[in-house]
Structures are given as structure tokens and as C-alpha cells.
């Protein structure tokens, strides 16, 4: 009888221990889940803040250039300003034409007045003039052409003959140029390649927090 009582006490003690361990585990799991949720909420707030700024800039650019006769396109997703290369250059040339300079003298002041206004300028990391070509010719030739064309736009903007405009000096802290050869083509709605639209120049902007937010978005998606 005494042995049976001892065994009963033993199993009761073991059961109590297991119950206590399960309670501790459940408590720790709850804490981890709550911390995870708070972390996700904070990350989402950061993503939303950057997304809101980007959307505000895109909306302002769209409003500024809608209905204009400049023949430009505002990408609703990225905010990239896109216009055909033949507006600025003659075929095969990287030198900005007379008509191209006239176009830039109208476009550039309007663009910088949006991008570098007080409520946006502290959020901007860089502004990139980016050149693109079609697939005609070898990669290196087109890379050189696209880079030269993008650089020539920046060169014209800061040349002595270019008209003064607000934010001109400030823009030097942001503006750079880049060429992508034929690596980022434009396709038609049916997915077919559009050589004419692929020959283009784009004005892009990057936000200071954008790269970090992209990393956060990857983590959120993976988790």
C-alpha cells in the first residue's frame, strides 16, 4: 500500500512538473508571437510611410504634366518620367539637339520644382537621368551610347547657356546619370518588343529609405 502511494505521488509530481513546463512554454510562445506581431506592425508602418511619400511625389508629377504637350509619360508605379530619345537626339547621336535643349528648358524647371520642393527634398536620395537604347547593335556600343546620352542631358542642364531655374544649385546634390544599353526594353501590351519606345531617356528618383524598405518587404514576404 505504501509502495502504491509512493508511485502515485511520483506520477502526480511528474504530471505537475510537465504541466508547469507546458505553461511556461505557452507563455514564452505567446511572448514571442506578440513580439513578432509588434515587429511586423512596425515594419509595415515604415513601408507605408515610404510608400505614401512615393505616391505623393508620383501624384504631384502626374498632376504637373498631365495634358502637357511635352510628350512624356509618368510611370504610375515608379514615378519615372519617360520620353522618346528622338525628342532630344538625332539618330545615333549622343549630342542633345537644338529642339532637345528647348524641350529640357521647359521640362527641367517643372520637374525639379516638384521633386525638390520642401516637403519632398529631405526624402530624396538621388535623381538619375537614365539612357536606354533599342536592341540594334552590340551591347557595348549601346551601353556607351546610352551613357553618353544621359550624361549629355546633365551637361546641358548645367551649361552656361541653359536658363536659370529654381533649385538649380540644390539639384547638384542629387542629380547623376546612367546608361543601361538595351537591358530594360519596353514591350507592347501583348508582350511584343517595342523598339521605338525602348529608345528613350528617363528621369528617376530614389528615396533615402527605399533600399532599406525593399529589404524589409522581402523579410515580411518571406515570413
Residue ranges with predicted function:
Residues 54, 58, 62, 101, ...:
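Extracytoplasmic/secreted envelope proteins and their assembly/folding machinery
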Residues 98, 130-210:
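Periplasmic OmpA-like peptidoglycan-binding domain that tethers envelope proteins to the cell wall
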Amino acid at each position: 500500500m505504501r509502495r502504491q502511494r509512493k508511485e502515485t505521488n511520483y506520477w502526480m509530481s511528474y504530471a505537475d512538473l510537465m504541466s508547469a513546463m507546458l505553461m511556461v512554454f505557452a507563455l514564452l510562445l505567446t511572448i514571442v508571437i506578440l513580439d513578432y506581431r509588434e515587429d511586423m506592425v512596425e515594419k509595415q508602418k515604415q513601408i507605408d510611410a515610404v510608400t505614401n511619400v512615393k505616391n505623393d511625389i508620383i501624384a504631384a508629377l502626374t498632376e504637373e504634366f498631365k495634358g502637357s504637350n511635352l510628350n512624356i509619360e509618368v510611370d504610375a508605379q515608379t514615378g519615372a518620367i519617360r520620353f522618346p530619345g528622338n525628342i532630344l537626339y538625332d539618330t545615333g547621336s549622343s549630342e542633345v539637339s537644338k529642339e532637345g535643349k528647348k524641350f529640357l528648358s521647359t521640362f527641367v524647371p517643372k520637374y525639379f520644382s516638384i521633386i525638390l520642393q520642401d516637403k519632398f527634398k529631405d526624402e530624396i536620395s538621388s535623381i538619375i537621368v537614365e539612357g536606354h537604347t533599342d536592341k540594334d547593335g552590340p551591347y557595348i556600343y549601346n551601353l556607351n551610347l546610352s551613357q553618353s546620352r544621359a550624361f549629355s542631358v546633365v551637361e546641358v542642364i548645367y551649361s552656361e547657356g541653359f536658363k536659370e531655374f529654381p533649385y538649380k544649385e540644390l539639384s547638384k546634390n542629387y542629380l547623376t546619370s546612367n546608361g543601361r544599353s538595351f537591358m530594360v526594353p519596353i514591350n507592347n501590351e501583348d508582350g511584343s518588343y517595342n523598339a521605338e519606345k525602348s529608345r528613350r531617356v528617363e528621369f528617376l528618383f530614389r528615396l533615402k529609405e527605399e533600399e532599406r524598405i525593399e529589404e524589409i518587404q522581402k523579410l515580411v514576404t518571406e515570413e
